Amino acid sequence: MTRLNTCTFIKQIVKMTSIAALLGASLNSWAAPTEIKFSHVVAENTPKGQMALKFKQLVEERLPGEYQVNVFPNSQLFGDNNELSALLLNDVQFVAPSLSKFERYTKKLQLFDLPFLFKDMDAVNRFQQSDAGQQLLNSMKRKGVVGLGYLHNGMKQFSASSPLVLPEDAQGKKFRIMASDVLAAQFQAVEAIPVKKPFSEVFTLLQTRAIDGQENTWSNIYSKKFYEVQSNITESNHGVLDYMVVTSNTFWKSLPADKRKVIKASLDEAIAYGNEIAAAKVNKDKQAIIDSKRSEVTYLTPEQRAAWVNAMKPVWAQFEDKIGKDLIDAAVASNE
């Protein structure tokens, strides 16, 4: 081969390599983004709903064209009884169940269902951000579930078709609960009848009088319109209803490290945003319910509240061995 031909050949190779590189870049730019499904069971105007939408916004802004987050609210994909199973099957990549939903994966998270454990949301937050609280995020890794952060909803209130002032007022009444042994024991302690039902069915159950009452936060009572089918709400602040945002270990490890870092930072920011909304909505949603005049709100006196505490606090001892006395003590210390 002559020198001229050799130069021409080399130029052709360089040209073809450049074309191939450009073609590869073009194909990459045309590739569909990776879908991330975020499923939850509440309305979009709740702290969880707004958090999920903020997460979508941040991920798609920071990783444009690479990831698309699709949010499915109101149990559109999965209900609260099967969303964790769907997560482990990779049918969805992110869910944020209430802490009550994890007892199949770890008994330690039953802590958050203990009645009258936390005095307010500040105490809840102090515990969740403590070493003990942060360790609980990793308590389900062996089962394939990765905890990424806590999301607040608020303190729970009782609602019923008749006034609930003293523990004996709950006797014989049916209350919907999440699938939690602690919550079942809580209502059994006042001789009420706990009924485990999905969140999506609560309104109809109340409307048809299939159950007499339920427990929930002001945000959920308002957004799901439970106040329209319950004549009485008691501001009991007897427990906390918070969530844990989780993914599967399989999905989390499948992400490139740099992308995982961006997604985690986006989630942290979205959770902080959701928690701000949760704090702001407590009084706003409560007042909206009062203004509707659909439900009468009862405020307990210190003596009446003490009666509920005395009736339900024995539940702590019932679950102490499963949860761990050290965790219960750490939670109690957060009230100080």
Swiss-Prot record:
Binding site for (S)-malate: 48, 101, 176, 216, 220, 243
Main location: periplasm
UniProt subcellular location: Periplasm
CDD domains: PBP2_TRAP_SBP_like_1
Source organism of the structure: Shewanella loihica (strain ATCC BAA-1088 / PV-4)
Name of the molecule in the record: C4-dicarboxylate-binding periplasmic protein DctP
SUBUNIT field: The complex comprises the extracytoplasmic solute receptor protein DctP, and the two transmembrane proteins DctQ and DctM.
One Gene Ontology term from the biological process aspect of the record: C4-dicarboxylate transport
